Amino acid sequence: GYPEQIKAWENIPTDDYLLKAKDLAANFDASAICKTVHDSGMKYLMITSKHHDGFAMWDTKTTDYNIVKQSNYGKDPMKELSTECNKLGVKLAFYFSIIDWTKQTPEPYGNVNPIDEDLMTTVIKPQLTELLTNYGPIAELWFDMGGPTAEQSQRMAQWVHELQPETMVNSRVWNKAGDFEVGGDNSVT
């Protein structure tokens, strides 16, 4: 399986995952990262804000399962990246997994994790709101995974555009609700 889906493939308990979280970001340096991005001529920096395992890489109010509360680092790396990107004129973009395996049964074998209304209203919308209101202009929201309904896909794209009209949304918000099309994993289009 995919290493980024190991929590589901190997049924790793969340408590075991948290043991590893303590040492996250020990050598994190937002200034050096953004300088490298800038000096290499890249126009934007895309960072994973939350992957399928549900661990948030920012100071979210929706769960204590985040880098600020669970790591020795204790700071918000998204805030630091936002500050450094702005200093250098680099655009910031977020990858955001629609699914959250702390809130639903993992289905790693296919993209069929249904999104229930509770997840939409208590996790997805509040987390998107935090990401799009606490870190300045966001160039792109890269959604991934999940099996939302067409109506849910439209709502997620709408939430993004209501908060930041210029933010691009990729096609992995599903159901033709994105602003541009992307290919599949491990494929060339």
What are these model-derived regions, one by one?
Residues G1-T189:
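Mature catalytic domains of secreted/periplasmic carbohydrate-active enzymes
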